[in-house]
A protein has these predicted regions:
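Short, acidic loop-to-helix structural element flanking the phosphoryl-transfer center
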Residues: 2-3, 13, 131-134, 148, ...
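Short beta->alpha linker loops
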Residues: 25, 208-209, 250, 287, ...
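Substrate-recognition "cap/lid" segment bordering the active-site pocket of phosphatases
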Residues: 176-184, 190, 203, 208-283, ...
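Non-catalytic, alpha-helical, charged scaffold/linker segments
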Residues: 41, 48-160
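Short, charged/polar "capping" segments at the starts of alpha-helices
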Residues: 211-214, 310-315, 335
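Acidic, Mg2+-coordinating phosphoryl-transfer loop and its flanking beta/alpha structural elements
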Residues: 283-325
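Short acidic-hydrophobic, aromatic-tinged amphipathic segments that line or gate anion-handling sites
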Residues: 233, 324-333
Length: 338
């Protein structure tokens, strides 16, 4: 049975990572990307299946029992491509190969907003290594190469070739995407979405590209509960931005696109040409600051779930931001009889 506060909403829009989907597979891919890239730059070949077997040991070493992930996320690193990239830059600056404790300490002493520090980091890295500054900059050749390696690990050989049209540089990667598990119990997630879909339009607004969204929700047999035109994802953002503007969260574009339908013209959304009355009966569910900021910019009610990277520590932030609801997880949407 659904909790009563949900009765007032006709549409529910879900962020995915930290809400339904876990970021664990992405962090695994980031660790393997760092490992492979550092080896590659020393001309040391890797064995992909062997790396998969030793994945937990590699991740523990690279991210210092995930402490490095937490520090970098707190300092504004939202993209997992950036997580891998900045870890390699810091490893080169610190001159480390196996012991990443120095990298963790370096990260702790960095600016509170690392997003403003990328160029300086690339410059320091250039001075330390002798590598070309332009090559080292974010979104330039080094970053692009690492992004490709990340996608190889995450998608696996078959999906990567289908998406990008060429064979991975190193084959034998089975794809971490296929190992994904929901952040709450699958049977509870299925029950929740089934009950919600009986009276509400369900949508997604996620930074994942379509293939990374559809694979897990298809595997978990929950895709059928969402509106066919309600799957807003990163592909829609790229198409709408056209290289001219930034429409990722905290911009409200993704939530608006999900609400009014992926066929609704982007220009009408961006020009404010839509029925605002629908927003009053829309609930946005997310786990991050960018989610609540986008919901507020849109004018929708917001429900925070504390299953993201910050966990229970995020409660104070969402209280200060005046979220309408703060729940431990999506399971709290249901009245579960024991």
């Amino acid at each position: 049975m659904l909790k009563q506060f949900l009765n007032q909403y006709d549409t529910i829009i879900f962020d995915m990572d930290g809400v339904m989907t876990s970021e664990q597979a992405y962090w695994d891919a980031a660790a393997l990307t760092v490992w492979e890239y550092l080896k590659w730059n020393k001309d040391e070949p890797i064995n992909a299946p062997e790396c998969m077997e030793n994945l937990q040991e590699i991740r523990k070493k690279i991210f210092c029992d995930d402490q490095l992930i937490a520090v970098l996320k707190e300092k504004g690193v939202n993209s997992n491509w950036d997580l891998a990239y900045i870890t390699v830059c810091m490893a080169w600056i610190c001159g480390v190969e196996d012991d990443f404790s120095a990298v963790l300490e370096y990260a702790r002493n960095m600016s509170e907003n690392i997003l403003n520090y990328y160029d300086e980091l690339a410059l320091l890295c250039s001075k330390k290594t002798g590598f070309d500054y332009d090559w080292l900059q974010r979104n330039h050749l080094m970053w692009q190469t690492m992004q490709g390696i990340f996608q190889e690990w995450y998608l696996g050989d078959r999906l990567f070739e289908e998406q990008y049209g060429y064979v991975p540089r190193i084959c034998g990667k089975s794809g971490l995407l296929f190992r994904e598990k929901p952040i709450i119990r699958l049977e509870i997630l299925q029950q929740l979405l089934c009950e919600l879909s009986e009276t509400k339009r369900l949508c997604t607004a996620t930074g994942r590209p379509s293939v990374e969204l559809f694979q897990p929700i298809t595997d978990w047999d929950i895709k059928k509960y969402f509106a066919l035109d309600g799957f807003c994802n990163y592909d829609h953002v790229v198409a709408a931005e056209q290289g001219k503007r930034t429409l990722t969260k905290p911009h409200p574009y993704m939530f608006l696109k999900a609400l009014y339908g992926t066929d609704y013209p982007d220009e009408r959304i961006l020009n404010g040409d839509y029925d605002r009355s629908k927003i009053k009966t829309t609930l946005v569910v997310g786990d991050a600051g960018s989610d609540i900021l986008a919901a507020k910019a849109m004018g929708a009610d917001f429900c925070a779930v504390l299953t993201g990277v910050a966990g229970q520590a995020g409660r104070k932030y969402f209280e200060e931001m005046q979220a309408e609801y703060i729940l431990n997880s999506l399971e709290d949407f249901l009245i579960i009889k024991t």
